[in-house]
Amino acid sequence: MRSPPICMKRTPKLARIRETARCKGADLCPASGRVFIGASGKRPRLSAQEYKHIVRILGNDLPGEKKAVVGLRQIRGIGYGFATAILDVLKIDNNSNIGYLTDEQVASIEKLLQDPAGAGFPTWFLNRRKDLETGEDRHIFTSDIEFTVRNDVERERVSGSWKGYRHMFGLKVRGQRTRNTGRKGGAVGVAKGGKVMPAKGGAGAPPQEEAAGAEPAKTDAPEEKKA
């Protein structure tokens, strides 16, 4: 006997599946309007217009099978907290696949990323506060991060500040200790047995042979008295 059909839960992720199932005449629960799946467990296929394999946001191609909160993190400058805040403000399910986002939702995400402060994001949530050129609080993404950091380092070097001095010589900038890490000199060689190799011409070097015909060196030691 065939197993009874399974009634799928009503979730935002499956909203489009229910709409497609209604169009194709699939079995629906008369009480809740949920989609029934037979014993095979196959879902109705979505058309190419509803699901997108690649979604482009801010010049980044995001795979459609990724969850929204995971896919947005592939954009440089967006972390987990920022991605979650974006989806919460726009009322988008975190677990929904990016491929199911509509064009309007994608446009709203890009609009919010261009001006997060205007959307109500707090100042401490942004990664570029009180910009030296404009004085504005903004959030930068992708290649703008590298460009901005490079300009900041160059400005410190030109101004001759202590930060610029450390950057110029490739040293640590933020007060880290450099006794063990951050060294650049060559390694000191040690002989087998743990003894340090003697320096050339030092105390451990063998005495040089006396030149032929030369008088032996005089010693200042006193002569012993004969008994």
UniProtKB/Swiss-Prot annotation:
Keyword flag Membrane: no
GO biological process: translation
Region (Disordered): 178-227
Pfam families: Ribosomal_S13
GO molecular function terms listed in the Swiss-Prot or TrEMBL record: rRNA binding; structural constituent of ribosome
Biased composition (Basic and acidic residues): 217-227
Ranges of Low complexity composition bias in the record: 193-216
Biased composition (Gly residues): 183-192
InterPro entries, per database record: Rbsml_uS13_C, Ribosomal_uS13, Ribosomal_uS13-like_H2TH, Ribosomal_uS13_CS
Keyword terms of this UniProt record: Ribonucleoprotein, Ribosomal protein, RNA-binding, rRNA-binding
NCBIfam families noted in UniProt: PRK04053.1
Entry's family note: Belongs to the universal ribosomal protein uS13 family.
Protein's name according to its UniProt entry: Small ribosomal subunit protein uS13
Native source organism of the sequence: Cenarchaeum symbiosum (strain A)
Gene that specifies this protein: rps13
